[in-house]
UniProtKB/Swiss-Prot annotation:
Gene Ontology CC terms: virus tail
GO BP terms in the entry: symbiont genome ejection through host cell envelope, long flexible tail mechanism; viral tail assembly
InterPro entries assigned to the protein according to its UniProt record, in alphabetical order: GpH_LAMBDA, Phage_tape_meas_C, Phage_tape_measure_N
Name of the protein this chain belongs to: Tape measure protein
Known function: Serves as a ruler that controls the length of tail by stopping the tail tube polymerization and is probably released from the tail shaft during infection to facilitate DNA translocation into the host cell. Assembles into a multimeric linear form probably arranged as a coil of alpha-helices and stabilized by the covering tail assembly proteins. Its C-terminus fixes the tail tip complex, thereby forming the tail assembly initiator complex. Tail tube proteins polymerize around the tape measure protein, displacing the tail assembly proteins.
Originating organism: Escherichia phage N15
Alphabetical UniProt keywords: Coiled coil, Viral genome ejection through host cell envelope, Viral long flexible tail ejection system, Viral penetration into host cytoplasm, Viral release from host cell, Viral tail assembly, Viral tail protein, Virion, Virus entry into host cell
Annotated compartments: Virion
Superkingdom of this protein's organism: Viruses
Biased composition (Basic and acidic residues): 380-397
Similarity section: Belongs to the Lambdavirus tape measure protein family.
């Protein structure tokens, strides 16, 4: 204010002015105000020096030291902010910068005294605002340079990763969404690209895994990224090196990658190696964080909190990705469209405002279209960059192969000439010194001369396939001829042909064929070497053949010895059994022989009589004998077995009729022969014999059927027919002691006949009369089958019932036999046909 007033005075002061007095008064007034202001400033400066002097005195240092310490504070605060932004440990920053501040003020307590005595709330606010403004400006600058840094990375790396700056920005955003900071992900991504990780890799997963691992372990990012770069060059070798350095992959994973690479699947091998490495780093990160102590975990959380705060500040200047721009444009258009739809029909809105709303909507729509176009262009750029990176990688690979192959195809003279021309051109253009030229040219000449001194390799002689096949067949022929001669010279059972003897013949035949082949063609190096060692090979084979023959003979002798020992054991046990069975029955002697056979079999197998296995077998055999003895005492089982055999024989209609027909045809043939030779035949005996066999067959079947029916119907005494039984009528009641026939037996005998049996009459006469003689049959055949029913009880009533049942059986049997004979003698029957053929 004082300077402005004096300046105005200098400009406006004019001696000739009519208002000189007024101006002079004005000057005096301004000078007075200037003096007062100067006095106030001097007083304030004096008070400030007093405060500084007091603060310095409280801190125990001089005013000069105090002023120097205060001047260092802004620099200390700047270092703190920079280190926090760089992701360093907050505790380490506190120890480092706090120690410097403490040393500046002479200790911890003097530091706080000095700060409390000099820093007022206003100064704190102004300082905080200044620091915040500076940090905000720094964050904006860092964020705005993100795309520029990404572009520099892609250009300097040749963009072998096949990415764009926008794609890198999106990948960093993905890492930020996954819990990392933008700087962590972008730094890991940048180092991976610089390390040479090629296109097609999963940069999002890899960059996040690297960022997490380096943050938890403290390993430099560039070191981990370099390990990924080795995978791009050679997946198997790179994975082995990574396992040796970080121990994050297993041998099985390395073997899988190697198998893919050997099969020619380079892309699959690289992808598998990247996946194995990423999974390994993630597992190690989790293990490190899970094993942190309480203090270490708290420090790690605080460090990540500072990083997140600084990362949020850096977001101020960072550009948006194409997708984020589209999302924001869509939100802006949606909002503008909603406002337009809300206001376009509002009668309180004038035309100017309505036009403004429409313009806002159209502007938002155009911005959305532009954002979508930019997103499409970004996607196209990403795809094109990926294709170009892959193509460039292949071109470089094949160029390196071509260069290596070209060097291999050059002759020694061509290499020397090219080197000489290169050196001459460099010398002519002044790009090489004469001394260096002489040394390089002499080295090239010596290398050329050394190649001339090397002996030329003669091409290896290869035996044609046809010659090899002929030699093999000839060797087999000679071998078989030798084997045939040995077999023809066989004189005794001790002649042997061991496997080693056959190998000797094979070697002899092989050498014979080689010697014959040497006369007609050039032998290969292998064949010459084999032929040179003929004597040694054959002598060794001859020795082996003799040993082999001895082994075969000894094996045969051992087998004979074993057979002899087994025979001695068998005869010894058989002799002992024979001696012990003297005076025994045939059955007991047979059992003793079986026990002796069991024992000699066990001994010949290598066991002894006291073995538990043999004792178990002997007990099982004796248990079988005991069961046989038990069955011999069971007469009922014997009777049942006999009846079962009888029933089985009677039910074999096929076998019985076959035997009957065979006997009949034989009898007819014999009678015919007798008629032709002697003029007469005994047809009566033949017919009688035939009828007797037929009667036996019918009688067997009748008895089996009758007994089966009777055994299922035992129990009636004085009962009667139970009736057929209607729908609601019971079929009768059976009382105790009654005999009940089955339905089939009742139908076969007849209800009327059964009633007549109960009364004493039946077909054929009175049942209870003075006995029924044998039924007479045609041709003089008599059938007599008496039936007796045994009853163990002495009850008279039951005895009478048994007599009646026996008579009923006899009547049924007689009727069945007579009916069968009657059918046989009728026209068409067996007997009728046999007798009428004469």
């Amino acid at each position: 204010m004082a300077q402005t007033a004096v300046g105005d005075l200098v400009v406006n002061l004019d001696v000739n002015s009519t208002k000189f007095n007024e101006q002079l008064s004005y000057v005096k007034k301004e000078l007075k105000q200037t003096g007062n202001t100067a006095n106030d400033e001097a007083l304030r400066i004096q008070q400030s020096f007093s405060r500084q002097e007091n603060a310095a005195r409280k801190a125990g240092i001089s005013v000069g030291q105090y002023n120097a310490a205060m001047r260092m504070l802004p620099a200390q605060f700047t270092d703190v902010a920079t280190q926090l932004a760089g992701g360093q440990n907050p505790w380490l920053i506190l120890l480092q910068q706090g120690g410097q501040v403490k040393d500046s003020f002479g200790g911890i307590i003097p530091t706080f005294r000095a700060l409390l005595g000099t820093i007022s709330p206003l100064m704190v606010g102004i300082g905080a605002l200044s620091v915040a403004t500076g940090a905000l400006f720094y964050a904006w600058y860092q964020g705005s340079s993100t795309l520029s840094d990404f572009n520099k990375t892609l250009v300097l790396s040749g963009n072998t990763a096949g990415l764009t700056a926008d794609r890198m920005l999106a990948l960093a955003r993905n890492g930020q969404a996954a819990g990392l900071t933008f700087n962590q992900t972008s730094e890991a991504l940048t180092e991976l690209i610089n390390a040479g990780v090629r296109t097609g890799s999963r940069f999002d997963e890899m960059s996040q895994a690297v960022a997490r691992f380096t943050d938890a372990s403290g390993v430099p990012v560039e070191k981990v990224a370099a390990a990924y770069g080795k995978l791009a060059t050679d997946p198997t070798s790179g994975l082995i090196a990574m396992a040796q350095q970080f121990h994050n992959v297993t041998a099985e994973q390395i073997a899988h990658v190697a198998q893919l690479q050997r099969a020619g699947d380079e892309a699959g091998a690289l992808q598998a190696a990247n996946e194995a490495a990423t999974a390994g780093f993630n597992d190690q990160t989790k293990a490190i964080r899970d094993n942190m102590g309480t203090i270490e975990s708290s420090a790690d959380s605080l460090k990540r909190a500072f990083k997140s705060m600084w990362d949020a500040a850096l977001d101020i200047g960072r550009p948006d990705t194409a997708q984020e721009m589209v999302a924001k444009a869509e939100a802006a258009f949606k909002k503008a469209d909603e406002i337009w739809n809300l206001r376009k029909g509002d009668r309180y809105v004038n035309d100017e405002a309505r036009a403004r709303f429409w313009n806002d909507r159209e502007t938002a729509r155009l911005a959305l279209d532009m954002a979508q176009q930019q997103a499409g262009i970004a996607r196209a750029n990403e795809e094109n960059a990926s294709r170009e990176a892959a193509a460039e990688s292949d071109r470089q690979k094949y160029a390196a192969q071509a260069q290596a192959n070209y060097a291999k195809t050059q002759t020694a003279l061509e290499k020397y000439t090219a080197r000489q021309s290169e050196l001459n051109k460099a010398l002519k253009e002044g790009r090489i010194l004469q001394a260096d030229y002489n040394i390089n040219l002499a080295a090239a000449k010596k290398e050329y001369e050394d190649t001339l001194k090397k002996p030329k390799k003669t091409p290896a002689i290869r035996t044609p396939a046809g010659a090899r096949a002929t030699d093999t067949a000839s060797a087999q022929t000679l071998e078989l001829q030798a084997q045939l001669r040995t077999l023809q010279e066989h004189k005794s059972i001790n002649d042997t042909i061991s496997q080693q003897r056959q190998e000797l013949w094979r070697q002899q035949s092989r050498f014979t064929v080689l010697e014959e082949a040497a006369k007609t063609r050039t032998l290969s190096a292998e064949e010459k070497s084999l032929l040179a060692s003929k004597s040694e090979v054959l002598s060794r084979a001859e020795l082996n053949a003799k040993l082999g023959d001895q082994i075969v003979a000894q094996e045969r002798l051992n087998r004979l010895q074993d057979t002899s020992q087994k025979y001695v054991t068998q005869i010894g046990e058989k002799t002992r059994a024979l001696a012990e069975s003297a005076g025994m029955s045939s059955r007991a002697a047979q059992r003793r022989n079986e026990e002796a056979q069991l024992l000699q079999g066990w001994k010949n197998g290598g066991g002894s009589e006291n073995d538990a296995g043999y004792q178990n077998e002997l007990q099982a055999l004796q248990a079988y004998y005991a069961e046989q003895d038990k069955l011999r005492d069971d007469w009922q089982s014997g009777a049942k077995s006999a009846w079962a055999d009888y029933v089985d024989s009677a039910s074999d209609a096929y076998g019985q009729m076959k035997s009957f027909a065979t006997s009949t045809f034989d009898g007819i043939g014999q009678n015919m022969a007798d008629m032709l030779t002697r003029g007469k035949a005994d047809w009566a005996d033949f017919t009688r014999s035939t009828l007797s066999m037929l009667t036996q067959i019918l009688l067997k079947q009748a008895m089996v059927g009758l007994v089966d029916s009777a055994t299922t119907a035992l129990g009636f005494a004085g009962g009667g027919y139970t009736g057929s039984g209607g729908k609601y009528e019971p079929a009768g009641v059976v009382h105790r002691g009654e005999f009940v026939f089955t339905k089939e037996a009742t139908n076969r005998i007849g209800v009327g006949n059964l009633y007549r049996m109960m009364k004493g009459y039946a077909t054929g006469g009175y049942v209870g009369g003075g006995g029924t003689g044998p039924a007479a049959a045609p041709f003089g055949v008599s059938v007599y089958a008496p039936v007796t029913v045994e009853n163990a009880s002495g009850n008279a009533q039951q005895q009478n019932d048994g007599d009646r049942l026996g008579k009923a059986y006899q009547q049924v049997i007689n009727k069945s036999v007579n009916d069968g004979i009657a059918r046989a003698i009728q026209p068409g029957g067996l007997i009728w046909n046999a007798t009428n053929r004469r």
